[in-house]
C-alpha cells in the first residue's frame, strides 16, 4: 500500500468522546508503524432552533436550543497491512461517526 493515504473523518456531539476516539486511532496507527498527521480540529457546526414556549399567544417568549457537531480529520500516510487490519478491529464508542476514505 505504498504512496497511499487513509483519510479518517470523525463526527460527534460530545467533544470528549471524539478526542478519546482520535487518540485511540493515533495510538493504533503508530503502534503498527504508520505515520499519522492530525487530528486536526475542523470547525464546529452549530445548529440553532427557536421554539415557541406557548401554544397560543406570547410570540416573543421563545426557547432556544442548539446542537453542536464536532469534527476531527486525520491522515495516515503509507499505511501497512497491519495498520488497516488494526483499524478494522478497533472498537470505538457508539456516539462517534467514522468516515474512512482511501486516497
UniProtKB/Swiss-Prot annotation:
Keywords assigned by UniProt, alphabetized: Ribonucleoprotein, Ribosomal protein
GO cellular component: ribonucleoprotein complex; ribosome
InterPro entries: Ribosomal_uS10, Ribosomal_uS10_CS, Ribosomal_uS10_dom, Ribosomal_uS10_dom_sf
Gene3D superfamilies: Ribosomal protein S10 domain (3.30.70.600)
GO molecular function: structural constituent of ribosome; tRNA binding
Keyword Ribonucleoprotein: yes
Cited PANTHER family: 30S RIBOSOMAL PROTEIN S10 FAMILY MEMBER
Protein name from the UniProt record: Small ribosomal subunit protein uS10
Lineage: Bacteria, Pseudomonadati, Pseudomonadota, Betaproteobacteria, Burkholderiales
